[in-house]
Design a protein with these regions (language model features):
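Carbohydrate-binding surfaces of carbohydrate-active enzymes
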Residues: 2-12, 16-470
Length: 470
C-alpha cells in the first residue's frame, strides 16, 4: 500500500523490541541437517545435554547446537529483513532489543546478539528513567557502539529517558546525553511528543518533550549541540585501547533452558560486565568484540587490526569455555607483540571438544605459563613485603600475557604500616602494560582525576576526542 513512498518518503523502518526466541530452543529438521553437516555427528542422542549436565560433552553439544541455531536465525530472519530494506533503498534500524544490560538475556532472546545486530543499518538501545550522572545504560550503549564500530556502520542510536517524569530538566537531558555520546552513541531520539492533551492519560513514560515544557523556547540550543556532536562522532574510525572478548561461547555452554543459566553462567555475566565498567570508568576505552571479528583480525607490530580498528590489548573476561580458533588467534596476537590479559577464570573447555580440552590447556600454557586457573600459584615478594597476584609471561617477539586471578573491582585499604600491596585492579594492570590513549597529568587515572569518560574518533588525519566529566 505504501510502495510509492519508498524510499523517497519512507527512508527506513525502525523496529522496537523484536521478539524472537523468548528463551525457547528451536528444533527443526533443517537445524538437525545443518548441525550434522557441520559437526559430523547426530545430535539427537545428546540433546538431553541442553537441559542437564552430561559431563564433559555438555559444553560441546550446547555450543555447537546453539551456534547452528543462531546461524539459521541469521540466515532466515536477521539478514533477510535487512536485505529486504536495502533492496528498496531503506535502512533497517533498532533502538530497542530485549535482554537489556544482560549477556544472558541477550542470548536467550536472540541466540547470538551480534548475529542479529550486525544486520541493522542503525543499531541502538533504550535508556529509560532518571539516574545520577554516570548511571545511564552503560552495557547496552557500549554493545550498540561496538557493533557500529566492528561492522562499519555510521550510526548507533538511543531512545532515551522515558519514565524520567515531566519534571526532567534540560540540565539532566544534556548531562545524560553527553554521557551516552561518551559511550559511543551518536544519534539522539527522544521517546515521544504527544500533541493531544489526552495523550498523557495513556502515556506511561513521560516526559513529552515539546511545546508544553517551559524549556521549549530554548530547545533549539540543545538540538544544535546534539546535531553538531552527532555529525562529528558519526565520522571516522573509533580508537580504543582494548578489545574485550564477548564471552558468548561461555554463555552458550551454561545455558540450561529459557532464562535459566548455571551459576557459572551468572558469574561470567556479572564479572564480565563489572570488568567492562571498571576499565571504562578508569579511563580505558574498549569495544566488545565477537568471535567472528576477532578471528578475522590481523596482527602487526603488537597491534590487533580488525578492518580499520586497532587495539593494543585483548582482554579475556572470566570464561568457562572458548572457541579453539579464538584462543589460537589470541595466542598469535601475543606472539606478534601484543598484550593479552585474562581475568579471574581461564577457560577449561572448548566449543569443539567440551570440558577439559587438552588443546585449550596447551594453548593456555603457551600463553600464561599455566594450563588452568586452578594451577596458578602467586608469589610473595619477601624483600619488599609486598604481594603481587599478577602473573606475567613474555614472548621473544615483545608480547606479554598477563593473568589476574582475583582482580579488585574496588580498592582496599591496608592498615598495617609494614605491609604493602600491589593494586591488582585490571585498569591498573592495563595502564602499566601499555601506553594508554588518554591519560591524566600527574600520573593519576582519569577516575582519580574526576570521573572523566571519553571516546576517540580518528577522522582522516584528525583526532577527535569527546570527554565528559561525570
Amino acid at each position: 500500500h505504501l510502495g510509492r513512498f519508498v524510499p523517497d518518503t519512507l527512508r527506513g523502518y525502525l523496529q522496537d523490541e523484536i521478539y524472537v526466541l523468548g528463551g525457547n530452543i528451536v528444533y527443526a529438521e533443517s537445524l538437525l541437517a545443518r548441525f550434522q553437516s557441520e559437526n559430523e555427528y547426530d545430535p539427537r542422542p545428546h540433546l538431553v545435554g541442553l537441559f542437564h549436565d552430561i559431563g564433559d560433552f555438555t559444553d560441546k553439544i550446547r555450543c555447537e547446537y546453539y551456534d547452528a541455531m543462531s546461524a539459521l536465525l541469521e540466515e532466515n530472519l536477521y539478514r533477510p529483513l535487512s536485505d529486504w530494506h536495502e533492496a528498496r533503498g531503506m535502512q533497517f534500524s533498532t533502538i530497542a532489543t530485549w535482554g537489556r544490560q544482560s549477556m544472558l538475556g541477550q542470548t536467550y532472546q536472540y541466540g547470538d546478539i551480534f548475529r542479529m545486530c550486525r544486520w541493522f543499518h542503525i543499531t541502538g538501545n533504550e535508556d529509560p528513567g532518571h539516574t545520577e550522572p554516570g548511571g545511564r545504560c552503560f552495557a547496552d550503549a557500549k554493545l550498540s557502539s561496538s557493533v557500529q564500530h566492528l561492522y562499519e556502520r555510521d550510526r548507533a542510536a538511543m531512545c532515551v529517558y522515558w519514565g524520567s517524569g515531566h519534571g526532567m530538566t534540560q540540565e539532566e537531558n544534556i548531562a545524560w546525553t553527553n554521557e551516552n555520546y561518551a559511550y559511543g552513541l551518536n544519534m539522539y531520539n527522544t521517546h515521544g511528543g504527544l500533541y493531544g492533551s489526552l495523550g498523557s492519560w495513556y502515556e506511561w513514560v513521560p516526559p513529552s518533550v515539546h511545546f508544553r515544557q517551559p524549556y521549549w523556547e530554548h530547545w533549539n540550543c540543545f538540538t544544535q549541540h546534539v546535531s553538531r556532536l552527532s555529525a562529528i562522532l558519526s565520522q571516522g574510525v573509533h580508537r580504543a585501547d582494548v578489545a574485550l572478548l564477548y564471552p558468548l561461547t561461555s554463555v552458550h555452554a551454561n545455558w540450561l533452558k529459557g532464562d535459566h543459566f548455571t551459576a557459572a553462567g551468572d558469574e561470567v555475566e556479572m564479572e564480565g560486565m563489572a570488568l567492562a565498567q571498571q576499565i571504562y570508568t578508569s579511563g580505558i576505552d574498549f569495544d566488545f568484540v565477537d568471535d567472528l571479528k576477532l578471528n578475522e583480525a590481523t596482527v602487526n607490530d603488537g597491534i590487533l587490526h580488525i578492518d580499520e580498528l586497532e587495539f593494543r590489548v585483548v582482554l579475556m573476561p572470566p570464561m568457562t569455555t572458548i572457541r579453539t580458533d579464538t584462543l589460537e588467534k589470541i595466542k598469535a596476537f601475543y606472539e606478534g607483540g601484543g598484550t593479552v590479559i585474562a581475568v579471574s577464570h581461564l577457560p577449561g573447555g572448548s566449543a569443539e571438544h567440551g570440558r577439559n580440552d587438552p588443546r585449550i590447556r596447551e594453548l593456555l600454557t603457551e600463553l600464561f605459563g599455566i594450563p588452568a586457573s586452578s594451577d596458578y600459584i602467586h608469589v610473595v615478594g619477601r624483600s619488599t613485603q609486598g604481594v603481587s597476584r599478577v602473573s606475567t609471561q613474555r614472548h621473544a617477539g615483545g608480547g606479554q600475557a598477563i593473568f589476574i586471578p582475583q582482580p579488585e573491582l574496588h580498592s582496599n585499604v591496608w592498615y598495617d604500616p609494614g605491609f604493602s600491596r600491589t593494586k591488582d585492579d585490571t585498569s591498573s594492570v592495563i595502564a602499566a602494560a601499555i601506553e594508554r590513549d588518554v591519560v591524566a597529568s600527574g600520573g593519576v587515572t582519569l577516575s582519580e582525576a574526576g570521573d572523566i569518560y571519553h571516546t576517540h574518533q580518528r577522522i582522516d588525519a584528525l583526532d577527535v576526542y569527546f570527554l565528559y566529566n561525570v
